[in-house]
UniProtKB/Swiss-Prot annotation:
GO terms for biological process: proteolysis. This is Probable cysteine proteinase 361L. It comes from Invertebrate iridescent virus 6. PANTHER family: CYSTEINE PROTEASE FAMILY C1-RELATED. The chain crosses the membrane at residues 520-540. GO terms for molecular function: cysteine-type peptidase activity. Keywords: Hydrolase, Membrane, Protease, Thiol protease, Transmembrane, Transmembrane helix.
Length: 542
């Protein structure tokens, strides 16, 4: 059955090939350098370029970390608090880690249709119908519950995905999409459990560049056409339980690409039933200057979409200062912006030069320079999940004594683990115009020092209309080694085969797991019917 939503947002055109035939300009998300694979070491062992950004990297630094003791385990990745007492060496290593986790292009517009006037009208009508208000809340966040939330919203927030860790595989294009797809099903009331969509399934079946990056828009079309299961089928154990993918000795493997670690078999771990999630094919890009969206309505449109539909996939430019680290103390290894000046990332801030105290309330000592957004400081592109928005009061935005402002921000879920960021893996990023390049609202064009043309920006929008379908999926020929998995075997043997309801006001159990209430209620109904029939039978016999 075709939904009203599908009629409103018809299938966008999926472009084959590249704009103007310029294949060399085609980049991919994922956090893995386009240039700088292992052969680059053979050409010049003293110099290598990651993500189009030159890095001074000496081959000896890689050799130094090839045989790290087992004590330096993945618990500290990606912060590497225990690696070395040599700050310079640690800085080299962290630079490589930062580059491998960052994507290199977010050109959603080339893959999807623009947000049309019909789309905009439908979204506005949906928002007004749901909120009974013309005013959006000043702050809203799918990752946090508040006293202002209705019971329905609280129930759905319990089903929202938590931050994952992509580790050293450049898979944020898959991890961000997997999280958001599950979130949108939860917000739509089509599931009463945390979906936990499998990013690994995407890397296997819709691989693109796998650990070398990919395009979230293309992946969404794949999911619309063919679906995707949960982590019960296959999860991220191939990386999270593999030292090569999680620890500092991975530095020796950056050039050789971690994609071969991804499972070769295309089946699930076990021959069992799993829920298949399919999204509607109405994938759109919300970005100013495209379709019915301009600077005047882009932020409200993104907010309305998130408020009514759920978290969204956003793409943005990362400059070097985004990953500038706290050098010491309890926050060591975290990006500096997370722990000062309200925790809001401002693209022109000199985070690398900051040497003051740490704390979100600290605003003094932070300086600003426009050079931070020069093309020389371009590090890559990144795909994340936008969870909501807010306003950070009275933070520093410039070098003047009166450069203090209430700054609107997007609240985002990253894929760098729970030890990075704030509140266990999240971060705030200033909205346009406080950030004019590192933001979601506008397309930004940039030329790298290597002459590579970059076009980034936008928010992907889609809907879901039908609940996931329980389906038996093929299993791998060989069962997995239990020691190589992150969970007990029973977790992977099936999804709980409860009834999936489409009621919009579904209230899940408090632990966020799937409910068997529906099945229990059905047995009561069947028993009552049988008793009623027996009573009628005996009455008629008399």
């Amino acid at each position: 059955m075709t939904s009203i939503i599908n009629q409103r947002w018809p299938l966008g055109n999926l472009m084959d090939g590249f704009p103007n035939g310029e294949k060399q300009n085609k980049l991919s998300f994922g956090g893995v350098p386009e240039k700088g694979y292992f052969e680059e070491f053979n050409k010049d062992p003293k110099y290598i370029s990651f993500s189009g950004t030159p890095e001074k990297a000496y081959f000896e630094e890689f050799n130094r970390y090839r045989n790290i003791d087992e004590d330096d385990n993945r618990d500290t990745f990606p912060l590497f608090n225990e690696i070395s007492s040599n700050p310079e060496s640690e800085s080299y290593l962290q630079t490589f880690v930062d580059n491998v986790r960052i994507n290199t292009d977010i050109n959603f517009v080339s893959k999807t249709n623009s947000f049309s006037q019909n789309d905009l009208s439908y979204l506005n009508a949906t928002y007004v119908d749901k909120s009974l208000s013309l005013e959006l809340p000043i702050k809203f966040n799918w990752a946090k519950t508040t006293s202002a939330d209705s019971p329905d919203v609280v129930a759905k927030k319990k089903l929202i995905s938590k931050p994952d860790n992509q580790y050293l595989c450049g898979s944020c294009w898959a991890v961000s999409v997997a999280g958001v797809v599950g979130d949108v099903f939860a917000v739509a009331g089509l599931v009463n459990w945390v979906p936990n969509i499998s990013a690994t399934y995407a890397l296997i079946h819709y691989p693109q560049g796998r650990c070398k990056g990919g395009d979230p828009a293309t992946l969404l079309y794949n999911i619309a056409n063919n679906g995707i299961p949960s982590k019960h089928c296959v999860d991220y154990s191939w990386c999270s339980q593999n030292r090569t993918c999680t620890t500092a000795d991975s530095a020796a493997h950056f050039g050789s690409d971690l994609s071969p670690l991804i499972p070769k078999d295309r089946g699930c771990y076990f021959d069992s039933e799993h829920y298949i999630f399919k999204i509607d094919s109405n994938i759109r890009t919300i970005v100013a200057g495209s379709g019915a969206i301009d600077v005047s309505n882009v932020q409200r449109t993104i907010k309305e979409y998130i408020y009514t539909t759920g978290p969204a996939v956003g793409g943005y430019i990362i400059f070097r200062n985004f990953t500038s680290k706290v050098p010491f103390g309890p926050h060591k290894g975290n990006s500096t912006f997370n722990v000062i000046n309200g925790g809001v990332y401002l693209e022109k801030a000199n985070y690398a030069q900051y040497r003051g105290e740490y704390g979100e309330h600290i605003t003094e000592g932070l300086t600003f320079s426009s050079s931070n957004t020069d093309s020389d400081n371009y590090a890559g592109g990144h795909a994340i999940s936008i969870m909501g928005w807010g306003i950070q009061p009275r933070i520093r935005v410039g070098n003047g004594p009166n450069d203090i402002a209430d700054v609107p921000y997007w609240y985002c879920r990253n894929s760098w683990g729970t030890k990075w960021g704030m509140n266990g893996g999240y971060f705030k990023i200033a909205m346009y115009p406080y950030n004019r390049k590192s933001q979601f609202s506008k397309i930004v064009e940039l030329m790298t020092p290597q002459g590579q043309h970059i076009r980034l920006g936008g928010v992907l929008a889609f809907t879901v209309s039908n609940p996931p379908v329980l389906k038996k999926l093929p299993a791998n020929k060989q069962p997995p080694n239990p020691n190589s998995l992150s969970k007990l075997l029973d977790y992977y043997k099936n999804d709980e085969d409860d009834i999936v309801t489409k009621l919009p006001n579904i209230v899940p159990p408090s632990d966020g797991k799937k409910s068997t209430t529906s099945k229990t209620n059905n047995w009561y109904i069947y028993a009552l019917i049988i008793i009623f029939i027996l009573i009628i039978f005996f009455v008629l016999r008399k």
